[in-house]
Amino acid sequence: MGYKSDQLLIVVSILEGRHFPKRSRHMLVIDAKFDGEQLSTDPVPHLEQPQFATELAWELDRKTLHQHRLQRTPIKLQCFALDTLTSAKESVGYVVLDLRAAQEKKQAPKWYSLLSSKYTKFKPEIQLNISLETDNKPAVDTFKAKEAPPRRSKVPGDLAGLEPKSLVPILNEAEGYHQIGPAEYCKDYFVLSVTIAFATQLEQLIPSTLRLPEPQPEFFFYYSLLGNDVTNEPFTDLINPEFEPERASVRIRSSKEVLCMYLSVQPKLQIHLCCGDQSLGSTDIALTGLLNKASVEIEHHPVVVEGAFILTPPNRAKQNLSAVPLEMSPTIGVSIALQKEIGLQSVHHPKEQPQSVAAEEVPTTPLKKSANLKEGARSPPPPKPLMFSDSPPTKDEATESEAESIKSDFQAEPPLSKPLTRSKSPPLSEPPLSGSHCPTPIQGVSAIAKNTSESSSAQKITVPPAAHHFCFTIDLRSIRNVDVGFPVNCILRYSYPFFGSAAPIMTNPPVEVQKNMEVFLPQSYCAFDFATLPHQIQDTFLRLPLLVELWHKDKMTKDLLIGVTKIQLSNVLSSEKTRFLGPHGDQCWRQTFSERITVTAVEGSKNKVAELSYIITLEDYGLVKVREVVVSESSQSTGQEKGSLPAQTLQSTAPLPEPRETLEYKAALELEMWKEMQEDLFVNQLKKKELVHMQALAEEWKRRDKEREALVKKKVAEYTVLEEQLQKALADLEKRERQLANDEMELKKLKAQMQLDCERSIQERQDSIRRVREDCMHQIELERSKAKQLEEDKLRLQQQVELERKLESTTKSKLHYKQQWGRALKELARLKQREQENAMARLKKQQQELEHMRLRYLAAEEKDVVKTERQELEEIRNELNR
């Protein structure tokens, strides 16, 4: 078994398919089974011509192959369609290959039709080839299935030996990311985020025997992301669950190839609905769709896997829940997104940023509890701001909650100083600050308090040394091609708390826009002054777009949200920089970007409803001069603000009044008199304005009253027409009722007649069934007798075939035995002759040895005789000498 020539490989090449239907949600997998060993191909897209390009191989020796060929062991290829969302596996068809067709020489591939195919209209086929190859490696076992060599991948040579199962995410707390793969090669940054947008029919998960905690149970969703436990905000109503869509994000430092390898071996993302420490239901979300898209599309845009997934109760609760239809099943809307960060690598390398440590410690950490977000909004930014935040949901119906989630996301990373807001068209709910148009905005920040008593308790904000003074302007210029089916009185609304104000900013007044018409928006220009770190504004603009809402203001009904659009503020960062001189002669930089974007509907198919043209500008005035500013808590009030006093003066106490003869007292008296005069003038102006506004209000009231009267008359006329129609319909109904009564009497008669006919036909059918049954029984008896006779013939023929096979085998064995017997006789005769020759040679040798021994014996005897005689002679000589 250890020789190379005895080891073979049965190789089944699965090349491609044809005549398959296209199913975007499914993948095709082929399982090949041979002698109890099963191999599978990689999942491929379910297209008309799927490309498998896979080889499956089994290792065995020639003796085992011969036995399998005698037994006609088949190779069965089963084709399955795998649902990427629910992981359901359904059979498409199968192919059976004959092992005897496998040859060691190369053969052309053939097309095989799928048997028992699910797609009966298409008749799908698979191109296959089966062959034998010599295995050059010594065999260890007699039979063992093994996988063919892996296909070539795009992983570089340095990572060729990297096993996907050995990849483990390592948390880098200092930089705020998870490292997957070797750090010297994996240097790209990715963001993996999971958003739970909505949930429905959750009450179906509560069995009748389950007792919920008192007095008011709280429910929440739980899942694990890269080893981090994530829960959303609890909610109490299962019938109408209301919770803000939340996004959990983790930053990953890896490469596209290594990240795909890591995702390929990860289990499905499991999301649980929990009450306390008990799981009421869960759903599994496969990451295969994300993996397939990430390998191709992630370089161009984020890849997303989203949908509504059905929650299934745990095994112990399934028996207590009744079956519900599909439309009543508990579902959860989830979106999983994987995005590659472009242009942020330089931000996270301290060597590339010549700034202080406080300015460099901005990278975000992985997941934390969402409750910490509120603390981060009140306190100065920590070295590692949180990245877990409420994000815009995937459903456009939750547009208002998108704005709130963006607001909370901004609060997670506040700017390093109190920003100023300046606007030529301020929002209705918040007046502009008096110091917003000042050329030195930082001094305006420090002089925002009303008086010295208020400034003593004002909040101090320390500006880091690396902070820059920025001015960001937004100009929503025009809107056109509004296509909603009716004229629109549109206003645009947006909010970006990072600029320092969470109040929404709106264009005013509303403008009427019709189809195929472009309108320039009034009071659409707004500017924001603030101080922050350069890389913090870059990171915020890249992560959070500006959400702009298109509203229709109707005088008679409630305001209607028509559509939304997102402005990518990061586009201004990539535009060309132009140099200009600031108000103090300093060198400043300006970046401007303009674009026309589409506004999509919030409901329905999310079609395009309008086009918006905008211009955004970012001005960098350089480093902030003032390192500590004082901001009053009432900085956004409508009262007058003293913007010229420094912070040190505001914190000092007022001096004691001097005698009346001093110039200061006279100046104060004149100032008070001037104030009273100005106050009287101001009151008169207010009264005049009030009169004008009251007249305008009266005219508007009269106009609207006339409109209401006309509308009421129109409605009365319409209702009169409807009343006539209803009376006519009532008469028709009475007529139809009488007709129905007559038809009912006729129907009863027909029913009785039909009953008689039915009974008669039933009797006739029973008689015919009895006759047919008797005929069938007789026919069955005949067929049974024929089958019995055929079975006997089959047994006889099988015995005859078996005897013939045994006779043939015996004849071959006898002939082989005779040949072996003749060879044995010849070998025996040759051995006997050789044995006789050897015996004769041994006999001669023994005779020679006996002769030599006899001669030696005789010589020894003669020697003894001579010795004896010598002794006797010696004795005689001795006697004679005596």
UniProtKB/Swiss-Prot annotation:
Role, per record: Plays a role in the microtubule-dependent coupling of the nucleus and the centrosome.
Keyword list, A-Z: Coiled coil, Cytoplasm, Cytoskeleton, Repeat
Cellular localization per UniProt: Cytoplasm, Cytoskeleton, Microtubule organizing center, Centrosome
Family per similarity comment: Belongs to the CEP120 family.
PROSITE patterns (alphabetical): C2
Name under which the protein is recorded: Centrosomal protein of 120 kDa
Chain coiled-coil ranges: 709-882
Gene3D superfamilies: C2 domain
Pfam family, one: DUF3668
Span list, region Disordered: 348-443
Domain C2: start-end pairs: 1-112, 453-582
Bias-annotated ranges (Low complexity): 423-436
Entries under InterPro entries matching the protein: C2_dom, C2_domain_sf, CEP120-like, DUF3668
The UniProt record lists the keyword Cell inner membrane: no
GO cellular component: centrosome; cytoplasm
